[in-house]
Amino acid sequence: EVFAEMGDVLAAGGAWVPGRAIPDYSPKQESAHDAPVLSTENLSFGRGAALGVGINLDFYPGEVTALMGPNGAGKSTLALTLAGLLKPIAGKVLIADNLKPAHAGREPIDWKSKELLGRIGMVFQEPEHQFAANFVRDEVSIGPKSMGQSQDEAYQTADRMLEQMNLTRFAKANPYTLSGGEKRRLSVASMLAAAPKVLVMDEPTFGQDFTTWTEMVRLIAGARDAGCSIIMVTHDEPLIEALGARRILVSEGE
């Protein structure tokens, strides 16, 4: 009854209203799938005991892949492994040969952290794990500066991302003072600003109202359409549907 009487008002304020249409940001055309940007070869991953063994996967430019499965199955651990932040127990994670750094191999786990910039980005389940600046605007500008933009150019990129994520008013705030949902939007904005070829995200839409959720989905779709391969751990079924994502079920021990 409340939703029937106040649905439009609640929706205008960003509330999730039952029956409200979910925007469609699925790809307009099938990806060519000429060559994967990231692959696994007989990958076994985990922290100590293996959570998954013998995994062979390919991830393509311009594609969104959803890692799904029950809690404890190892989705976040797999995400960290794919992002080059956790060493495989066995097997390999390999980036496309044309994307590897000069004088480096194809395995991201062997790279220096600065070599990941512009190649592989990671949005952590706990956003605070990636904050490195004292101010929100500076946080978003780190990636663009590291990619060669001047300070003015990096700030322009940061300002654009903050506006799109509805975070402009927090530009001079400390990232740790933001709410949980705001921190998550900041972490996504920071990674998108660096324009990586592969973006791994752990529960990117958690804690968002409908308005900020929709804007985040739009930005993720934009990165996909620009050729980024996006891999996301999520339980968000509307997100998967809105992006037309490929689904991979992660099940412990398989």
Q: What positions do the PLM features span?
A:
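Conserved ABC ATPase "signature" region
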Residues: S141, D152-F170
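ABC ATPase NBD Q-loop/coupling interface
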Residues: K92-E115
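H-loop/switch region of ABC-family ATPase nucleotide-binding domains
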Residues: T234-H235
